[in-house]
């Protein structure tokens, strides 16, 4: 008998976003993309702002935006702890576009209130949200 699924928890500072059996997930760690399948080697790593791509036990694909956080892989349990996590279908495209434009403007016109690093992080978060929205539209 082979194990085909494991339990995934995605938790933000505000609430639990996802809890269920999945076949696999894909997420971006600090050293690159990670594909987590059943019986993956235990792992604890930081994850970058971006998306979690997951396939549920019934084959359904879902996308979750995360602002960064921690990924913990145990034998049959994977946990994502994120500062912010939003299901893809709950993202607001106009708001994400405005955030992107504001971040680009902040990078162009740096002042004492915001560093280049802060502005770059905000831009990365906005681009990640837009990527999730684009993937969801493409899947429909």
UniProtKB/Swiss-Prot annotation:
Q: What does this protein do?
A: Produces ATP from ADP in the presence of a proton gradient across the membrane.
Q: What is this protein called?
A: ATP synthase epsilon chain
Its main subcellular localisation, reduced to a broad class, is: membrane
Q: How does it sit in the membrane?
A: Peripheral membrane protein
Q: Give the species this sequence originates from.
A: Baumannia cicadellinicola subsp. Homalodisca coagulata
Task: Please tell me whether the keyword Membrane is annotated for this protein.
Answer: yes
Subunit field text: F-type ATPases have 2 components, CF(1) - the catalytic core - and CF(0) - the membrane proton channel. CF(1) has five subunits: alpha(3), beta(3), gamma(1), delta(1), epsilon(1). CF(0) has three main subunits: a, b and c.
Q: Does the keyword Ion transport apply?
A: yes
Underlying gene: atpC
Example GO CC term: the record gives:
plasma membrane
MF-aspect GO terms: ATP binding; proton-transporting ATP synthase activity, rotational mechanism
Task: Give me the segments passing through the membrane.
Answer: none
* Family, per entry: Belongs to the ATPase epsilon chain family.
From the Swiss-Prot or TrEMBL record, state where the protein is found. Answer: Cell membrane
InterPro entries recorded for this chain?
A: ATP_F1_dsu/esu_C_sf (IPR036794), ATP_synth_F1_dsu/esu (IPR001469), ATP_synth_F1_dsu/esu_N (IPR020546), ATP_synth_F1_esu_C (IPR020547), ATPsynth_dsu/esu_N (IPR036771)
Q: Which keywords accompany this UniProt record? A: ATP synthesis, Cell membrane, CF(1), Hydrogen ion transport, Ion transport, Membrane, Transport
One Pfam family, short name? ATP-synt_DE
């Amino acid at each position: 008998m082979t194990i085909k699924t494991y339990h995934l928890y995605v938790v933000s500072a505000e609430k639990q976003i996802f809890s269920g059996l999945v076949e696999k997930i894909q997420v971006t760690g600090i050293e690159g993309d990670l594909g987590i399948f059943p019986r993956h080697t235990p792992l604890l790593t930081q994850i970058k702002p971006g998306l979690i791509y997951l396939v549920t036990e019934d084959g359904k694909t879902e996308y979750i935006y995360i602002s960064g956080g921690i990924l913990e892989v145990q034998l049959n349990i994977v946990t994502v702890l994120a500062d912010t996590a939003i299901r893809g279908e709950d993202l607001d495209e106009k708001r994400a576009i405005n955030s992107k434009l504001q971040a680009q403007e902040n990078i162009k016109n740096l002042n004492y209130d915001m560093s280049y690093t802060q502005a770059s992080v905000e831009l990365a978060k906005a681009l990640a949200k837009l990527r999730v929205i684009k993937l969801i539209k493409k899947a429909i």
